[in-house]
Amino acid sequence: MIRITTNSSLRMYRSNLMKSTNSLNSAMTKLMTQRQFSSYASNPAAATRAFKIHSSLNATNAQYSNNDTVLHKYETAWSTLASVLDGYDGLVQDTGRVPALSGLNDTNLSTLNTQGQIIREGAEAIIQAMNGKYGNNFVFAGADSLNAPFAINDKGFVTYRGVEIDNPDTLDDIYLDDKGQPIKDANGKDMTNKEVLDMWNEEHQYVDIGLGFKLDGNGEVIPSTAFDSAISGIGIMGYGVDADGDPKNLASIMLRLADIFEGYDHETQTWNVGSRSEAEELLKKLDASREAMGEKWTTLDTEANFLDKNGTQLKNTYDALNVERSNLEDIDPADAILELVWAKTCYNAALQVGTNVIPQSLMDYMKSV
């Protein structure tokens, strides 16, 4: 016959009471925190998986934010080009082609000066539009989005980051930065203004939008794993001069047309700056430049559509990850309440058992304390 001593009964009771207390505390904590576990030790496997999911959620959220920012930037760029190029309502048509065609009409030669002023104002409006911003960043400034990219200097030339983009007399000059220092190329040679413009036109601003962002052995971004968010204004509008020495930039062509028109002397019927044939040729080049910009406009639209679809994919990925996280971490309120009720019942039962296990003298002592 096994004899159960009072001390043995007390030890068993204390152990069971502690288990009931812990179960009650655990059930109460679950209901208050709405979480399945509050520490790694509670459920190591689930906690490890949850940590990985949280990491993926944070990365996906950052990628979605990057994608959304770039998308709005591209939408702003698209809208800007629409105001410049769009059909019969764009700045090029209203303030470029129409006044140019009107001025070159023999019956309107007397209005050439006025038409020239309209064209000049149109070119200035285009430059202002191309200095548009999204948030605090200039849209068409390439990788240097904190400074306005375009201007028209005192000599009447369009500049990009301070460099005249189509002045034949300065394109081959050595470029000097704000401190008067040249920039060296890969071979240690001083770069010319044209070479610097080429460099700016090719610069990149890579952003992680969930394409598998990765660096190569030299710490450079692998292009296929990121999105290049840099939009070069000169890449869109053109820069440099053609074989005839005429500007390729759309606004510069308009400024040159304005110079020719404003230089016409109606009284003597002479072209003091350029000639009629030059103006007619520039008008053709204006159309060609607008067509080239239209192709870049289409490219922007294609890239904006890609960003829009990528944003939808990132959102779907985030939602799927969040569902998995919720299944691991979040409680079912009904189950949690039932668990709490059961734990409370067990705890009360354990207390009730104590009245039969603990000697009456000890119970009386505990009541008197």
Regions found by a protein language model. Give the residues of each.
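Amphipathic alpha-helical polymerization modules
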Residues: 1-146, 262, 266-369
